[in-house]
Curated annotation (Swiss-Prot):
The active site is at R23. PANTHER family: PTHR39159, UPF0374 PROTEIN YGAC (PTHR39159:SF1). SUPFAM superfamilies: FomD-like. It comes from the Bacteria. InterPro entries: DUF402 (IPR007295), FomD-like_sf (IPR035930), Ntdp-like (IPR050212), SA1684 (IPR016882). Mg(2+) 1 binds at N87, D103, D107. Its EC number is 3.6.1.15, 3.6.1.6. Pfam families: DUF402. Belongs to the Ntdp family. This is Nucleoside triphosphate/diphosphate phosphatase.
């Protein structure tokens, strides 16, 4: 796969552990790529669910994917401030079709006031049993929750105000 460059549009596909397609985002604009990560933006992006329901994202969001960490981060930019939705997920892979990852159900929501909430624990436990997540995956995900919380608490990477401003401004430059 040719590495997408700044200003290119890619598709993002989220799968479940059993290999079923979970969700697809069309036309995510790439803001930056390097050997380990991709930063992009969704702005009124078409999302298709596994049951073919479709919806469009309401606000611009900076998305961050990494090849080594078991999470991805969505910084949702609203008038009242930035909030975050973090998916516990496999590191991404990129092929000719899309950026792809496995969604492991657990999510961390960070509200604009900094409050954090772990979401979908019951869904994770149900899928862990039904889809037979290996113990290694369970351990990796729990360790990555700790890394993610450290990033949040210390405003690392996508959780810094500067990060969101830099990439949101870059998006506006590219879309002209």
């Amino acid at each position: 796969m040719k590495i997408p460059k700044e200003g290119d549009f890619i598709t993002i596909q989220s799968y479940k552990h059993d290999g079923n397609l979970h969700r697809t985002w069309r036309d995510t604009m790439v803001l930056k790529t390097n050997e380990n990560s991709i930063i992009g933006v969704n702005d009124h992006t078409l999302v298709t669910e596994s049951d073919d329901r479709r919806w469009v994202t309401r606000e611009p969001a900076i998305v961050y994917f990494h090849k080594k960490f078991w999470f991805n981060i969505i910084a949702m930019i609203r008038e009242e401030g930035v909030s975050y939705y973090c998916n516990l997920a496999s590191p991404f892979v990129l092929d000719n079709e899309a950026l792809k990852y496995i969604d492991y159900d657990l999510d961390v929501k960070v509200f604009k006031d900094g409050e954090k909430k772990l979401l979908d624990v019951e869904e994770y436990e149900r899928h862990r049993r039904n889809m037979h997540y290996p113990k290694e995956i369970d351990h990796i995900l729990k360790e990555n929750v700790k890394i993610l919380v450290d990033w949040i608490n210390n405003e690392k990477g996508p959780f810094s105000k500067e990060y969101v401003e830099i990439w949101y401004n870059r998006y506006h430059q590219l879309k002209k």
